């Protein structure tokens, strides 16, 4: 599993299998996971910063991380396969 998908798995451990499977076959989802991993890393960096803009950046990254997490959930829900009923 790549590091970006692992970030999504850490956030949604009960969805690890679908995350890994979708990441393996969907480039857009891999990109979404990469954006999520980057945003989480930046959030942690800013939380540890002493910069004057720290609070502003932390607030911005919290919003971004939550939005990307919501997109991950939505993508996973939309990717669920519903089997056809047997005839």
Each language-model region and where it sits:
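Extended, charge-rich alpha-helical interface modules
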Residues: 1-87
């Amino acid at each position: 599993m790549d590091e970006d998908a692992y970030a999504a798995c850490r956030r949604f451990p009960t969805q690890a299998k679908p995350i890994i499977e979708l990441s393996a076959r969907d480039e857009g989802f891999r990109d979404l996971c990469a954006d999520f991993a980057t945003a989480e890393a930046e959030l942690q960096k800013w939380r540890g910063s002493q910069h004057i803009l720290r609070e502003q950046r932390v607030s911005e990254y919290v919003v971004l991380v939550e939005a990307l997490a919501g997109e991950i959930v939505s993508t996973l829900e939309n990717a669920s396969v519903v089997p056809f009923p047997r005839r």
